[in-house]
Amino acid sequence: MRVVMTDEEQQLPEAKWYILHTYSGYENLVKVNLETAFQKNNIEDRLVDIRIPMEDIVEEKNGKRKIVHRRMFPSYVLVKMIYTRDMWHLITGTRGVTGFVGPQGKPTPLTEEEIRRMQLEKVTV
């Protein structure tokens, strides 16, 4: 199995996936606020991707089936970025963000196995 990266990702090999914890229901606002914060601080080149993984669920209500679009990981946002220590306050100070997921709230990048299981990267066989 081989991971295929886009041109943008190849230019930023040190970019890694991190998970941010957010207030419930603030995931989309956090995404917009992070993009804005990176732009205002002229570091948008360090931000590769922000994702809120969604899934379609079939619900049955009153005998009718309906497809509902739901967050796979409520209260979490996945961010691929080039992380540096000076960004910690920028990210954790973003409205809606409660912190990084990791031991003692320290930014911990996802492992290759976690990235594969979450299907965050394009993979070819």
Model-identified regions with their sequence ranges:
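Acidic-enriched and Gly/Ser
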Residues: 2-125
